[in-house]
Amino acid sequence: MTNIRKIHPLMKIMNNSFIDLPTPSNISSWWNFGSLLGACLALQIVTGLFLAMHYTADTMTAFSSVTHICRDVNYGWMIRYLHANGASMFFLCLFIHVGRGLYYGSFTLSETWNIGITLLLTVMATAFMGYVLPWGQMSFWGATVITNLLSAIPYIGPNLVEWIWGGFSVDKATLTRFFAFHFILPFIITALVMIHLLFLHETGSNNPLGISSNPDKIPFHPYYTTKDLLGAILLILPLMNLVLFFPDLLGDPDNYTPANPLNTPPHIKPEWYFLFAYAILRSIPNKLGGVLALISSILILAIIPLLQTAKQQSMMFRPLSQCLFWVLAADLCTLTWIGGQPVENPFISIGQTASILYFSLILIIMPTVSMIENKMLKW
């Protein structure tokens, strides 16, 4: 008798995606981050749902409702900090996942890559709106500064900003709509994840060698389910360490002060995972130029398949490209550090240099070095 998981219409989908899925036998731990992102998304949806049961999206009560969650709700403090620090883990996994795609040439799977970029943008939008909800000082001023960037769009900019605000400043209408969007977007993200996996399973996974995996594949279960479970445990350990011992390590002290439109904090900055883009935005003195650079810093990922000049898909056997990849990683760390510093020298000039290096590496230096490597290999 045929196993029910292979014939039942619903179970067949699960079976072909997570049990009998033919998987390359040599994919390394860098491939674990896809499943970890799924775990992070599930955690965010569950904790977010419980927070939404107690949160009120009103300027008068939002801050006190978050305080109420932390003080009066059973394990409310834990749910809140799991949600806040879970977002940090989510972005850490996202950046590593994208980095792995760049290093091993997974961007050649164009549909999967493009849906991935859409996912990255959607997750960033969701996280930004979530940061506004506690209605602390940094929530309010972060929302004001970031939404104000749209006013740089010629002709329609100012009207667009007021339309997003629902008035002439960030106020009750803004908070209500941000909560509505923050609630619905994770479910849209879940749908996009399914499309991401659909396209991935059409072509099959890439592997560290960058060659065809067809001659040597193994079933996903039990090999990679066990491996993913180990990855999840190793992710939970630092997350729980953060939540239970250092819950405010990655937050901003200003967000423990209720939002006050009459008092601007000395340094307005977003959460750590947006600091690299924020540093690029600040490194250009012109408002429109800064906004374009900010958008380009993410959307540049979409043109990476067009910039591929290497004859080998993976960087596994390309030491020069490997060095440049890690220079790019170090550059992004530098930008993250600069984004959290005040706007004064030497931070301004370091930020400008790091921003120029970021775009130069992706657009010019890495494609050129790939061509040199082709010549060295006589290809």
Curated annotation (Swiss-Prot):
Q: What is its main location?
A: mitochondrion
Q: InterPro entries, from UniProt?
A: Cyt_b/b6_C, Cyt_b/b6_C_sf, Cyt_b/b6_N, Cytb/b6-like_sf, Cytochrome_b, Cytochrome_b_C_euk/bac, Cytochrome_b_N_euk/bac, Di-haem_cyt_TM
List, separated by semicolons, the cofactors it needs.
heme b
Is Iron there in the keyword field? yes
What GO molecular functions are on record for this protein? Answer: metal ion binding; ubiquinol-cytochrome-c reductase activity
Q: Which residues does the record give as a ubiquinone binding sites?
A: H201
Q: Which residues bind heme b b566?
A: H97, H196
**Coiled-coil intervals, chain numbering:** none
Give UniProt keywords alphabetically.
Electron transport, Heme, Iron, Membrane, Metal-binding, Mitochondrion, Mitochondrion inner membrane, Respiratory chain, Transmembrane, Transmembrane helix, Transport, Ubiquinone
Could you give the cofactor binding note from the entry?
Binds 2 heme b groups non-covalently.
Instruction: Give the UniProt subcellular location, in the record's own words.
Output: Mitochondrion inner membrane
Write out the transmembrane intervals.
33-53, 77-98, 113-133, 178-198, 226-246, 288-308, 320-340, 347-367
So which domain of life are we looking at? Answer: Eukaryota
Instruction: Spell out the GO cellular component terms annotated for this protein, sorted alphabetically and separated by semicolons.
Output: mitochondrial inner membrane; respiratory chain complex III
Share an example GO biological-process annotation for this protein.
mitochondrial electron transport, ubiquinol to cytochrome c
Q: Which SUPFAM superfamilies does the entry mention?
A: a domain/subunit of cytochrome bc1 complex (Ubiquinol-cytochrome c reductase), Transmembrane di-heme cytochromes
Q: Name one Pfam family in it.
A: Cytochrome_B
Which residues bind heme b b562 per the record?
Answer: H83, H182
As for membrane topology, the entry says:
Multi-pass membrane protein
Report the protein's function: Component of the ubiquinol-cytochrome c reductase complex (complex III or cytochrome b-c1 complex) that is part of the mitochondrial respiratory chain. The b-c1 complex mediates electron transfer from ubiquinol to cytochrome c. Contributes to the generation of a proton gradient across the mitochondrial membrane that is then used for ATP synthesis.
Oligomeric state and interaction partners are given as: The cytochrome bc1 complex contains 11 subunits: 3 respiratory subunits (MT-CYB, CYC1 and UQCRFS1), 2 core proteins (UQCRC1 and UQCRC2) and 6 low-molecular weight proteins (UQCRH/QCR6, UQCRB/QCR7, UQCRQ/QCR8, UQCR10/QCR9, UQCR11/QCR10 and a cleavage product of UQCRFS1). This cytochrome bc1 complex then forms a dimer.
Remarks, miscellaneous? Heme 1 (or BL or b562) is low-potential and absorbs at about 562 nm, and heme 2 (or BH or b566) is high-potential and absorbs at about 566 nm.
Family, as annotated:
Belongs to the cytochrome b family.
Q: What protein does this entry describe? A: Cytochrome b
